[in-house]
Amino acid sequence: MGMYLVSVCAEDWFTEGEDGWGDAATALNGELRLRGLPPYESVPAEADFVRGSGQTFEEKLIPSMNGFWDLCQAHLSREDAETVCGWTLLVPFSLDGTITLPVDSGYSDSTVVVGAPQLLPMAQRLAAAVELPPETPQMCDNLDLTTWFRDGAAKELATARPGPWGDDLDTAFYVALFLRAAEHSIRRGCPMAYC
């Protein structure tokens, strides 16, 4: 099985219990109200799967994140590095910092929420630092990044056109993953979560 980063549709966002994100949605809306912000209710419905359409997002986290963490520490402030690596729920709107919810995220006892508009410039800085190539898949409907990095296309490109990104493909994978996740969340107006 492993760990995946996926887009969350309205049906899953509003479903309570283990099968959905309703507990986190309710807790988040409570925190937003405390901050004088409107509730987050405009989550898009599940889209039909069409490869390359950019309507869904699913990637598998396979490689080690050690090199990615080192890259974050080298190019971001400590706070930004922790933001990039520490969230468990990404939302498509701006937040003034992270929000920690007392809701099990599936991987920890709490859910750490970050706004994609805050994550995106951090991911863009990392992409610039490694010179992520334009051939990196833009849409991540069904393991497109995972396949590109794991099945040889990235390695072939790194051999043909060397660059900092090709020196550590595992690190480049995570740079691309977080960049594309933030872009997808903003473009589709949907949350992103690990499952």
Mark where each language-model region is.
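Acidic (Asp/Glu-rich) sequence patches and key acidic residues
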Residues: M1-H184, R188-C195
